[in-house]
Each structure stands twice: as C-alpha cells, then as structure tokens.
Amino acid sequence: MFVASKQADEQKKLVIEQEVQKRQFKKIEELKADMQKGVNPFFKVLFDGGNRLFGFPETFIYSSIFILFVTIVLSVILFQAYEPVLIVAIVIVLVALGFKKDYRLYQRMERAMKFKKPFLFKGVKNKAFMSIFSMKPSKEMANDIHLNPNREDRLVSAANSYLANNYECFLDDGVILTNNYSLLGTIKLGGIDFLTTSKKDLIELHASIYSVFRNFVTPEFKFYFHTVKKKIVIDETNRDYSLIFSNDFMRAYNEKQKRESFYDISFYLTIEQDLLDTLNEPVMNKKHFADNNFEEFQRIIRAKLENFKDRIELIEELLSKYHPIRLKEYTKDGVIYSKQCEFYNFLVGMNEAPFICNRKDLYLKEKMHGGVKEVYFANKHGKILNDDLSEKYFSAIEISEYAPKSQSDLFDKINALDSEFIFMHAYSPKNSQVLKDKLAFTSRRIIISGGSKEQGMTLGCLSELVGNGDITLGSYGNSLVLFADSFEKMKQSVKECVSSLNAKGFLANAATFSMENYFFAKHCSFITLPFIFDVTSNNFADFIAMRAMSFDGNQENNAWGNSVMTLKSEINSPFYLNFHMPTDFGSASAGHTLILGSTGSGKTVFMSMTLNAMGQFVHNFPANVSKDKQKLTMVYMDKDYGAYGNIVAMGGEYVKIELGTDTGLNPFAWAACVQKTNATMEQKQTAISVVKELVKNLATKSDEKDENGNSISFSLADSNTLAAAVTNLITGDMNLDYPITQLINAFGKDHNDPNGLVARLAPFCKSTNGEFQWLFDNKATDRLDFSKTIIGVDGSSFLDNNDVSPFICFYLFARIQEAMDGRRFVLDIDEAWKYLGDPKVAYFVRDMLKTARKRNAIVRLATQSITDLLACPIADTIREQCPTKIFLRNDGGNLSDYQRLANVTEKEFEIITKGLDRKILYKQDGSPSVIASFNLRGIPKEYLKILSTDTVFVKEIDKIIQNHSIIDKYQALRQMYQQIKEY
C-alpha cells in the first residue's frame, strides 16, 4: 500500500510538472507571437519582488538590524534609556513603509546622497569635471524659482560627481578617450516617418534595432541613446517675392511662422567600450598606464581602437535604413572642428557652438562646459545661466512605474511635446554568465520572499527566451530633462509631459529629490542615474524607436534656390516645401507635380498660396544663366474663376475666353512675330508648324478621326495646299487682320466644293459669318503676352464645349511651350483632365512634360477627381513624369485609383481619406511621404478671400478690372473684401 501511495504521489507530481511545462510552453509561444508583432513584455520580476528580501531591499534589512542593535547597546545597556530605541524603530518602520510603496526609493536615496553628501561615498569622488557649476543665491532669481541657499555644497558635490566619463583626449577621428579608460563614439541617426509608414513596414524596420543589441552581449560596451528636441526659429521674413500682393501675403505668413513653435528632433547613439574590463583577453588594468613599456601599451590601445571602430561600423550597417552619420571632424575656413565634441557640449545646456579640434589636447574636460556659466537648482525646477547671460529653465521627469509591455510607439507623445528636451536612455548588456547568475539569484529571491508561481513561470519563460538567443538582458536607466525659456512655459511643459506619460500607462512626476542626478545623467553616464534596473534588449530598442520625420526637404540650395515655403509637420518640425527633386542650385531637376484634392479640401488655396511664394524666384540666378533668361513666368490655367482674384492681386493679366466673344487670339500674327525676332531657325519653323497643325485641325473638325485624333478623309493634296497657304500668309509681309478670312480668299476656286478647304474653314471665318468666327479670325494683335510675370487663363466658358475646346487648348499649350525658353517657368493646370480631354492636346502636353525639365520649367497638374484624370489619354505619362505628388483630403477616394495614378500605399490612402484637415500629404519619388499643415489661421481674411475667389465675387472683380480709373487693382480688391460685413 505504501508503494502504491508513493507511486501515486510521483504520478501526480509528474502530471503537475507536465502541466506546468505545457503552461510555460504556451506562455513562451504567446510571448514570441507578441514579440513578432513588436509587443515586448516587461519582466518586472527582475527589478521588483525578485530583488528584495521579504519585500524590502536586502541592504535595508541588514542596515536596519545593525542600527537597531547599536541603538539598543548604547541606549538600553549603557544608559537605560528606551526612547531612542523607540524613535529609531519608528523611523525604520516609516522608511520601510516608503519602500513598500515605492521599491525604487532606496536606490534613489542612495544615488541622490552621492550628490547631497558625497563624503559618505568615496568611490564616486572624481576630479572636478566643471568648475562652472557653482551655486550663488540671487534674490532676482528667487523671484522666479524658490532657491534654497543651503544647497551650494550639494551642487559643488554634484559637479565633482558629474560624469564618470570625463573627456581626456581625441584618440582618433570620431573617437574620444575618457579618463576612465573607455572609448566613446557617436552616430547621428535619422527618424522613421511613422505616421505615413505601414505598421508591417514599421515592425520590419524596428527589427533592425532589435538585432543591434542582440549582437552585443558583453558588459564592456555601454550604449547611450539621446533624443534631442531643439526649438528653432523659421525666419523667412526677409525674402522678396517681387509682386505686391505676394509680398504682403507672404510677409504675413512668414511672420506667423516666425512666431510658431518649430522644433528639430534628432537621434544620437553613443557607444562606449571599457578598456579595463575587456573579456576574452588578459585583463588590462590601470597599472598598464603607469608602466614604462609605452610601446606595448600603445599597441594594445591601437588594437582596441580598431576593434571599437569595427563595432561602430557594424552598428552603422545594421542601422543603415536610419541613415547613420558618424560625428567626426570637419573643416571650415581652414580650421578643424569636432562634431562629436559639439554634441557632448550641447548636452550640458542645449547651447550650440563650434568646437575646435586639437588632437594634442589632453584636457578636453576643461573646455567642455557647453557655454554654461552657472546652474541653479530648486525643488522641482532649475535655471541655467549661460556665458552670454541668457537664461534657460529646466525640469527633470521621473518615471516611477512602467507600462506592462513596451512597443515602438511608447514615447511618441513625448516626441510630439511642445517643448525642448533631452531624453537619454542608458543600456549596458550583460554577458551570458552574468545572465545565468542573475536569473538564478532572482529565482532564489522569489522563493525566499514568498513570490508567486506566476513570477516563477515568468522567470522560466525569460530563461528560455534568453537561452534561445531571442533576447538579451542589460542594465537600463533614463534621464528626461525638459527645457524652456520661461518659468511658466516650463511648468506647462512638465504638466503636458507627465500627462502624456501617464496616458501611456507610466507613473511619472516632476523629479525633486533626484533632480540633480537626472540633470547630470543626461550626458553619457550611468553613475548619476537615480534608478537602474534590468530590461530586455527588445525593451531598450522600443525605448529608443526613432519615430519622427526622416525627410524635411531642403531649405536652401535647391534647383531654384530657397525652398518654396515652410510648412509645419505633425511633430512640429519644419517641412521645407519644394516641387523640384533634390539637387544643387542651378541644376536641371524634375519638378512636375500632381495635386489631388476634393471640393473644399483647400486645393485652390494651396495652389494660389504656393504660386505667391514662387514669386521669390524672380531673383537669385546662377552666374552661368544669361541675362535674357533671368526672369520668371507663371501661367495659371484656371477653371470656374478660382484663381481670378489672386492673379489680379499679383498684378497679372487674367485672360477670360468667352463663347461667342472675340478671343483676341491670332495664331498667324504670333507666328509672323516670331519670324521677325532673334529666334533660332528651329523656333521659327516650330511656330509655323504649330499654326499649320492648328488650321488643319480646324479644317478637319467634322471629319471622322482615328484613335490618334487624325482625320481619315482629309486628303494629302488638301493638306499640302493648306500648309503652303499658311506658310505664305505668315512669311509674307502683309497685314494679318482676320487671317482665316484671308486664307479662304486664297482658296477662291474652292467655294462650291462642300468638302473643299473653303467649306471646311468657313465656320471659323468672319467674312462667311461662321459659327466660330470669334475663335482665331481676329485683329493682328495676339492677346497672349508671356513677357509678363503672371498670367491667368480661365477655361470656365469653353472647356465643356467640345466644338472649340480642343483648338483653344492646343493653341494655348503651343504658346506656353514656346515661352518655355530657358527662363524659370511655372505652368499650373487646374482641373487638368478638362484641358487634356482631346487626344491631340493630351499628346502635345505629354511631349511638353517630357522636355520641360530641360527648359527649366515645371508643370503642376491639379484635379478634384482622380477618376477623371485616369481617363485622360496620357494618365500613365502623368504618373511617370510627375515625381512630386501632393494630396489633400478626399473622403470619397478609391484606393485602386490612387495606387494606379500615384503609387499610394494603403497607409497613405487612409491618411488621404481621413487624416487631412488643412493639411497635405507630400510624396516625392525616392523620399518618404510627409504630412504637413498649411494652417492659415491668423492671416488677414481679405488675403484668404483673394487666394480663392468665390463665384459670387466674379462680377465685382470684373468691375474693378474694367474700371480704368482704378490703378491699384490689388488695393481695390482688399477694400472690397474688407467692406463685406462678414469681415
């Protein structure tokens, strides 16, 4: 019976063990599945219950027992006094309750005391890093921050303990040796456009960060990652836009942008290799540096240096998609500077300044003060006094509790804060043996402290993942320091930051007791961090996810010079809008742009706004551009008068072509004019060819056409006769009033032939009172004048009339192409599908799109309906020839249409249909897409009315144009809108 009972117990234990293994296996699979999705658990067992003895820090238990024992000996045995024992016991209980509430309290107190009372911690007393950190109480400053005059000794101590890594000297280009015998190198990394990139692609990109820290499992390496958000001022108020309204509008816009809060967000990864604790080699210690055998020492250093550089190159390769740039030396005006030291200097007080590199300098630390004169600490805030006597306020944020799981979007809200900050994450990997010891130690502590089975299972899962190489572990700490120009702004920033962190599942608050620790730890230092705990390599990778904006355009040195204008991205960084592809100033670059936006999305406002901004390109040409080409012409092909007021206010001519009214167009007169200019023979022949083609199109208007729009029944003989007559009329020295009439008169013998040339051209002739006589049979002065800077042409009346629209459009585009002669040229075509409806016109524009870049011209095609544009005969050419696409909101869009015309991703389409309110989605070939705002709030409302003309104001604008006594049409428009009661 005993044997049977024993077997039953063993069987029961086996079943339980199998069940535990199943549960553990299931949990591991769940964890792996989450990790594949970019969701990584925090193993709090490593820094919560597992690191405590009976729920309290082990050292606290031992020190409390010792203090209580000493108190009893001194008070009870020697003096028979029980009160001290009671007091000490109460203090211990109160502190214990504090530890129960916040298990980090003990470590924070211990590390903070290194600043408060450093004489108790001899191990951290180093040579003073910066003498500038001194406390000088000031009544004036006390008005802003309640300073504690008794903290001077603490601050001096803090300076003494500022950094474990005091910079000693340059060891190589981009490598600095510290006085703790470690090497430092820093890489600047670009962000990922997380708002416009699909979740799947983000996970794949983020996996490259995971791989970096799985490759480093030795404690000789430490990593310091800095997210730096710096306020910048966008000042473009000195730009000259040449046109009166353009100057007024853009001045108002640029002044508004100058007042806006713009930030530059950057990411830096600093790698530290400790030369004293190198594994797998004879340990090198400080006595090597006191040896007389310097050659051997230098050989070791060189070997370590090469190894260090190889590791940095490996990291750069693994993070290649983040566009890594090593911070090295650079030369300016014959002087060598160090980008690396400039960055370390910047971390002191967020002051930017050049740093001259001297390889022989052995006392870098004496120069690395960051332009800071004094630092003052109060309870929750501090103040920096710079060398130039400017002031900056700061506050540190302490994160007490972390969310249960980490993801790459953990700190997105922090990156979007309306505040300057430096967010430092420090990570030191553990080697395999240390990991095993750590897990075994934690396992014992769980048992001793009465931990739960869940904790044990979690630890088992962690051991399995570490053993399989899925993750590694390391020590981690962080320092988040906010900066502001005023105390009120500082308080507001702290409030927003704490609120943002708490919303993500953290427990955060403004640091008080440990503020000095956080302030000094933001450099590259573990020693001053108030709290260090263990996290997985994936957790750390999530903390440092570089989610920002990798493409911000170019502010300067573009094809035509400066950027068109500055917009604001979703993370409050500047986006420098350009239509040209990135290139050097003066280079021929593709700038054709497709603009898509539904009714009410702000398409007309955006086009008019940017048209005004491009007025600046009338100035500043490369030296190799001839004088006659140093000009700018902008042509706006309008519909429904949307740009009417804007063109007039800019001082341009607005050509309205009305059905049945003489257009003022005379192609013959234009071609004859070209013959008398200094145009090349090719240009002269082209002008004649255009008129020949146009007249042939008129003559074959009613004929049946093939797929290319050519007449099937028009004979070659008639074609040759017509061509010869057109050439004679243009090249002959005669009056070209009513050229169609003159052409018909030349074909007198054809009068009675219903299919003859006379009959074919009669509808366009005044002498025969033709239906379309108003088109081209006009006086000998052509209305179109492309010598002006801005011209508008409205197609509202004729675009829907298929009888005349193809001819007008053909002639307009032919004239425009002739004007693209090497000058800077902008052609805007609103509702482009209407202008390109005829195949012959479409193919003509197709050829123009292919050659315009070489002519220094850009074409911007816009439409409300992407479906209509897809029906255009040259839709494929538009997609290929327009490297820049700009999308405004379209709630009713179709994904397949957007993919076909503009290669839009599902994520981008989701943004277009849901996320664009007075914003654009900018997409340029070879660059990530960007969401940017063109918010015009604060701009005078009469300016906004001018940018986009409502049809109810068309007649009022007509009156202003027709009233020749009104000299300044722009001011008349302003007054008209200002007088409207709504404004």
Curated annotation (Swiss-Prot):
GO annotation, cellular component aspect: plasma membrane
Native source species: Helicobacter pylori (strain ATCC 700392 / 26695)
Locations listed in the record: Cell inner membrane
Catalytic activity: ATP + H2O + cellular proteinSide 1 = ADP + phosphate + cellular proteinSide 2
Taxon lineage: Bacteria, Pseudomonadati, Campylobacterota, Epsilonproteobacteria, Campylobacterales
Gene3D superfamilies per the UniProt record, alphabetical: 1.10.8.730, P-loop containing nucleotide triphosphate hydrolases
An example molecular function term from Gene Ontology annotations: ATP binding
Phenotype of gene-disrupted mutants: Deletion of the gene affects pilus synthesis. Mutant is unable to translocate CagA and is unable to induce IL-8 secretion by gastric epithelial cells. Deletion has no effect on assembly of the Cag outer membrane complex, but the mutant machine completely lacks the entire cytoplasmic complex.
Protein name: Type IV secretion system protein CagE
Main location: membrane
Signal peptide from the UniProt entry: none
Top EC class of this enzyme: translocase
Designated gene of the protein: cagE
Chain residues that bind ATP: G597, S598, T599, G600, S601, G602, K603, T604
Annotated keywords: ATP-binding, Cell inner membrane, Cell membrane, Membrane, Nucleotide-binding, Translocase, Virulence
